[in-house]
Amino acid sequence: MYYRSIKSEIIQTICTYHEEPSLIFNKICRTKTETLLLESATVHGKKNIESMLIIDTAIKISCFKNIVEIEAISNNGLFLLNTIDLKILKKKSTKIKKKKSNVLEIHFPIFNYFTDEDKKLFLTSVFDALRIIKKSIKNPEKSKMGVFFGGILSYDLISSFEPIPRVFNSKYNHPDFCFYLSENLLIFDHKKKKCKLQTNIFTDNEEEKLNILKRIKIIYNQIKEINSKKKNNRINTFNDFKTKNKKWVDCKNDSKVYKNKVKKMKQMILNGEVFQIVISRKFFLPCPYPLESYIFLKKNNPSPYMFFMQDRHFVLFGASPESSLKFSSITRKIEIHPIAGTRPRAFSSIKKIDINEDNKMELAMRINSKELAEHCMLVDLARNDLSRICLPGSRVVSDLMKVVKYSHVMHLVSKVEGVLRNDLDIFHAYQCCMNMGTLTGAPKIRAMQIIAEEGEIRECYGGAIGYFTGKGDLDTCIVIRSAYVRNGIACVQAGAGIVLDSIADEENEECKNKAMAVINAINKTL
């Protein structure tokens, strides 16, 4: 298919390295929306690996059911919005409306759920909006990744592709997906202690190009100033806040209600409805300082995936241990990392890890038949998901049941990978694999239908956050161990996988243990 090409000029500026990108976020983006910080760290050494910070967004792409809204955030983005050729979409039974001078709305046809599984991947869908924008931008050959899109894919997006009832119990209209196309992106390589600013220029207006160059200089100087005044650039971190008013409120699913739900799910399993299902609890608490809470969470619970997304309507932050979907455009290798099997860490009376008791916890998890059966079931589910999109014979389980330990819990982790078919892209892959079995259950579709029948909207929880690039790479994590903040109130959601052998008290405690790292981080800033 032909896409009219829009040339992207990329300027890379070497900036002064800083070991703590959240300080730069605080300095440059504290009051800016449509900003995003993505980070990764080693679990045991607590060492930063890489950070990527969208300082300025060119365009924002949001999806609400079958409507995709493309909004130009900058003049540079407005040029891109007015240049993208959307005629291809008009041929696919879509309607395009100009909502404002800087906002386009694309109305997609209702998806036909009951088509053949392979044909379903090629039906017109809301992913075509992301696909066309990505393919319309010509990336410089010398650029390693090309343009950069960062954002979220909500759990409830699945209702646009599968016969899963939509839940409407929230007064807020949360997007099914929301991505920012970066205009100014800071990239930190913490191993090499290097930092560079990547600027994307789409406009051909010389005056606007000069404005962008001025913006580069401002950002460069702001970063330099932070580094020259490290001692005086501390954020009001957790130590500066009173912690007397610690409180968290359980919404709807208190312990008694949750245990009853576990019993109900076990009966459905016994009736043959599902083999396993993930039901969750929501905890609400005040969160007036989400950035400070994120910093505390990052310090005490370093994870492979950490994120702080600041939208005009919400803030989402977290430290997730679990990859959602990862794809390399060079090798075409696609990966899923199922996590199932959880035990709390063992602490001594002085709140330090008791190594002897911790090892006993690990052994108990490794030999627990319920945990092993649940994990194998989800590894098999990941294999099935990849079999639909990978080349025959390329799918393998490269890691099986490794133990990974975090601040409050330990998990069993596996890795399933394969080679993506040549006729498919990252959007086909995500469409086929969402939502991950570790947050839904098995069989996946029926499990999600039952979760929807519970009448509790999940929004971000159980969805994915991460990025994709102009060159076609994708790296996302599952949104867990996170807080979704609106109007100063955080919602922390955590779930447990229910099987026939589940014990209600243990599953209830597992939810609390999983939520505790985030709740503690927020409480430290109250």
UniProtKB/Swiss-Prot annotation:
UniProt cofactor note: Binds 1 Mg(2+) ion per subunit.
Pathway: Amino-acid biosynthesis; L-tryptophan biosynthesis; L-tryptophan from chorismate: step 1/5
Keywords: Amino-acid biosynthesis, Aromatic amino acid biosynthesis, Lyase, Magnesium, Metal-binding, Plasmid, Tryptophan biosynthesis
Group of enzyme by EC: lyase
Gene encoding the protein: trpE
Chain positions recorded as Mg(2+) binding sites: 374, 510
Protein name: Anthranilate synthase component 1
E.C. number(s) listed in UniProt: 4.1.3.27
